[in-house]
């Protein structure tokens, strides 16, 4: 088999999109706490080397498993991939920030793909948390991203930079055409919340410092 082709297929397969769909979150969260899924989950983490298949972030902690086709009844190994918590929440836009799950803001950012933004946020949050020489620059970049939420609200209305509100509006309006969904989400990205992921960020940052010290 052509290795380059396999890699190209994999990259294409793991393109990160924002998705809002009724029912998926319920099945996903039920599976997450199902003890029977734990050993299956470990198989996937090991296969993917604990690496997010969307943004490339590698960590032993707080990685999730998502279904590539968005069907949470299709739990074949080939349909399941490792996703960091920033990328995983993109599959459940309507549930972001609801009941303690995830957190973030919808922003207008045509310059970066969603996966690129998530990857950059891992770097920014680590720089801020570990109080590196780049802390102030990282804070400024993150702040400038957050400011982009105003463009979303100007276009779609007050409150629509809240992913749960935007996602629920999409579900309620019955948008199930891929073409319309892509148009609505065009150039819109989900900016992960530093405050909501504080626990995860602090653990990752501590691990990064340990690796440097080793």
Swiss-Prot record:
Its main location: cytoplasm. One of its GO terms (molecular function) is metal ion binding. InterPro entries: HNH_nuc (IPR003615), T4SS_Dot/Icm_subcomplex (IPR053558). It is found in: Cytoplasm. One of its GO terms (cellular component) is cytoplasm. Zn(2+) binds at residues 52, 55, 84, 87. Transmembrane segments: none annotated. Keywords: Cytoplasm, Metal-binding, Protein transport, Transport, Virulence, Zinc. Component of the Dot/Icm type IVB secretion system (T4BSS), which is used to inject bacterial effector proteins into eukaryotic host cells. Part of a subcomplex which recruits effector proteins and delivers them to the core transmembrane subcomplex. The T4BSS is a complex nanomachine composed of several subcomplexes. This subunit is part of the Type IV Coupling Complex (T4CC), a subcomplex composed of the DotLMNYZ core and the IcmSW-LvgA adapter subunits, linked by the C-terminal tail of DotL. Six DotLMNYZ hetero-pentameric units may assemble into a hexameric nanomachine, forming an inner membrane channel for effectors to pass through. Interacts directly with DotL. Interacts with DotZ. NCBIfam families: IcmJ_DotN_IVB. This is Type 4 apparatus protein DotN. The gene is dotN.
């Amino acid at each position: 088999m052509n290795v380059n082709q396999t890699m190209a297929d994999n990259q294409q397969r793991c393109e990160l999109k924002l998705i809002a769909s009724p029912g998926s979150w319920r099945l996903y969260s039920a599976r997450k706490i199902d003890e029977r899924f734990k050993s299956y989950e470990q198989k996937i983490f090991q296969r993917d080397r604990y690496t997010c298949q969307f943004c490339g972030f590698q960590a032993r902690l707080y990685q999730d498993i998502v279904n590539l086709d968005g069907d949470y009844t299709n739990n074949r190994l080939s349909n399941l991939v490792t996703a960091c918590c920033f990328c995983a929440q993109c599959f459940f836009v309507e549930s972001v920030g609801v009941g303690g799950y995830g957190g973030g803001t919808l922003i207008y950012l045509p310059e970066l793909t969603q996966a690129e933004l998530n990857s950059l946020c891992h770097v920014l949050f680590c720089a801020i948390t570990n109080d590196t020489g780049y802390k102030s620059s990282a804070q400024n970049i993150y702040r400038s991203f957050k400011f982009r939420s105003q463009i979303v609200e100007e276009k779609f209305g007050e409150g629509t930079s809240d992913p749960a509100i935007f996602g629920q509006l999409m579900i309620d309006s019955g948008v199930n055409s891929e073409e319309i969904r892509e148009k609505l989400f065009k150039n819109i990205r989900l900016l992960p919340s530093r405050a909501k992921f504080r626990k995860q960020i602090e653990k990752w940052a501590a691990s990064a410092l340990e690796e440097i010290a080793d």
